[in-house]
Amino acid sequence: MEFFISMSETIKYNDDDHKTLFLKTLNEQRLEGEFCDIAIVVEDVKFRAHRCVLAACSTYFKKLFKKLEVDSSSVIEIDFLRSDIFEEVLNYMYTAKISVKKEDVNLMMSSGQILGIRFLDKLCSQKRDVSSPDESNGQSKSKYCLKLNRPIGDAADAQDDDVEEIGDQDDSPSDDTVEGTPPSQEDGKSPTTTLRVQEAILKELGSEEVRKVNCYGQEVESMETPESKDLGSQTPQALTFNDGMSEVKDEQTPGWTTAASDMKFEYLLYGHHREQIACQACGKTFSDEGRLRKHEKLHTADRPFVCEMCTKGFTTQAHLKEHLKIHTGYKPYSCEVCGKSFIRAPDLKKHERVHSNERPFACHMCDKAFKHKSHLKDHERRHRGEKPFVCGSCTKAFAKASDLKRHENNMHSERKQVTPSAIQSETEQLQAAAMAAEAEQQLETIACS
């Protein structure tokens, strides 16, 4: 406990433990579900949290809560993160600590950029303490951790301050490689070293696949660890990041100036640059392979409930019952304006927008709005430059499934490929078959007589 006495005898006390206890208490309340006023659903996993904490840590949630009217019963579904990644992000918000698997470092950085969490977004410019395995028994631990402490003050100064190197200068890692083998303790120095996360640190991960990561306007190469790379341990390894509980100055961080990145943030908030993976069966796109595999099971799953009228199969009895309405012609939902009837209530709701001209699905990268969510998704793909629908004949890609279908009908359909000679040949074959049938009929008539 420290205290200061000014000339006016005003005593000020600083409780150094308050911030730690404050976060600890908040986290305990979250884990017990106490005073939680928001639920976040990620991949069917529900996370309870406090809106004030989410908004304080993430500019994404801050903007989202301002745009949406939410209360204690509100549930927000996020479809651009894995549940395990979001769980670690949430733990970071409440504990200032985060553990990341090496193969997920790039994904965590991308998540930090999307959610507007500066510490996670700046992992590529942070400094990490490399903790080596314990070799006291001649064997390494099952894991070693890279411990990252958040730099304090200006970002430029943070890159040069508090860098402690282990070993002689000649033994330090080069700009091209960083050895994962722990340093020897015979020199009497600590087995922990702090390194700048620049290109050398990123190359420590090794790579067969290199992709670009945007770090406040500068592109660096980020690489994923190949399985054959030996970094000092044959067992799975993890990265542990600790965010110091330092006072955050009210200054604009490079790359997040309000004027320059407002549109960029809107793009990240509602239509970020994640690469989309398309289902080969129906063309629906997903942000990660896990969701795609889950969706593909819908195409390959058993469909024991078969419609007797059209033989179409369904996975559940409820889906079959809903389908049967098509054959019965039963349309219980009628439009009050024009009287048109529909089988399903959602279809009626879509139709009513024709009369009201309501466009509830707005693009947050421009001012355009749409009546249907599917139209908005097609529009957002154009912003992101995504073309997940690929023609199987010529490999040309399209942003909309309808564009692909139109292309296939116009360029690769059978009627387009039929040449005049083929038509003539087919006509001659039909004529020959007709003449043969007529001759055969005449022979049968003669035989009967």
From Swiss-Prot:
This is Zinc finger and BTB domain-containing protein 14. Ubiquitous. The keyword Zinc applies. A motif (Nuclear localization signal) lies at residues 50-66. A zinc finger (C2H2-type) spans 277-304, 305-332, 333-360, 361-388, 389-417. Keywords: DNA-binding, Isopeptide bond, Metal-binding, Nucleus, Repeat, Repressor, Transcription, Transcription regulation, Ubl conjugation, Zinc, Zinc-finger. Interacts with ZBTB21. The lineage of its organism: Eukaryota, Metazoa, Chordata, Craniata, Vertebrata. It holds the Pfam family zf-C2H2. One of its GO terms (cellular component) is cytosol. InterPro entries: BTB/POZ_dom, SKP1/BTB/POZ_sf, Znf_C2H2_sf, Znf_C2H2_type, ZnFinger_BTB_dom_contain. It is found in: Nucleus. The keyword Transmembrane helix does not apply. Residues 36-102 form the BTB domain. Residues 156-194, 405-424 are annotated as: Disordered. GO terms for biological process: cardiac septum development; coronary vasculature development; heart valve development; kidney development; negative regulation of DNA-templated transcription; negative regulation of transcription by RNA polymerase II. Residues 405-417 have a biased composition (Basic and acidic residues). The BTB/POZ domain seems to direct the protein to discrete regions in the nucleus.
